[in-house]
Amino acid sequence: MKLLIMIEKIAALDIETENTGADVRNDNKRIISIQIYNKDISEIYYHDSKEKGLKLGKERVKSLLSSGYSFVGYNVLNFDIPLLKEFLDLEIPLSNVIDISQMNKVVELKQNFKMYKLEAICAEIGVRCDHKKLLVPMIEKLKQDPKIVERAKIEGSKIASLKSWSLQFSQDRALDLICGGSAILQAYNEFVESNGNTNSIFHQYAMGDVISEYELYNKLKRNN
C-alpha cells in the first residue's frame, strides 16, 4: 500500500510601494516591487526593470497559484492583496492566502504586549529581521529636513482630529511614516540606477522582509 504525502506549497509574498504620505493605506501611488521567497524561490520584480518588470511578476504569481501554491505574508490581507488588485489587477483568492498577523501567537502578542510591527514579532519569536535597520540612516537624515517636518505637523494635525489621538503623537507618527516611505523610495531609485544591484540597500531591505516573513511563518507553524 502506497502512502501519499501531500507537500505543502508555500511561498512568502511581499510588495513595496511608493508612499511618501502619512496614510499607510490610502497614500500609495504605485507598486514598485514584488518579492517572492521560499527555500527554492528567491525573486524580485520591479517597476523600472526591462527584464524583471511587474508584468512578469504578476504572471509569476499567477503561475504559482495555478500550480497549487498559497502565499504567506505579514498583514498581507489588509495591504499586499488589496493593493495588488488595485494597481496590477492581480486577484489572489483568499483561500490561497495565509496572513501571519492573524496566527494565534501573533494575535496574542498584539493583544497582550501591543506588538504590531514585523520586527517586534520577529524579535519575540526569534527570527532575524536586521534588514529593517538599513533604512535608519536615511530616515534620520530626512527627519532633519524642515519641509518634511512642517508637512508632518500639518498631516499630524489632520490625523489627531480624525482619530482623537494626541497632537504630538499624531505628528510624530506622521513624521515616521513620511520619512520611512521617502527612504524606501530613495533606496528604490538608487537600486534602479544600479541596474538592480543585489547588494543595494533596497534589494537587501525588500528581500529581507519576505525572507523574515517566510521564516516567521515556518517557526510559528512548528510551535503551534
Positions of PLM-derived features:
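Entry/capping segment at the start of metal-dependent catalytic domains
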Residues: M1-Q35
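Acidic, Mg2+-coordinating catalytic module of metal-dependent nucleases/exonucleases
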Residues: E124-N224
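A generic hydrophobic-helix recognition signal that picks specific residues
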Residues: I7-K9, G73, I92, F202
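Pocket-edge positions in alpha/beta enzyme catalytic cores
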Residues: N26, Y46-S49, Y205
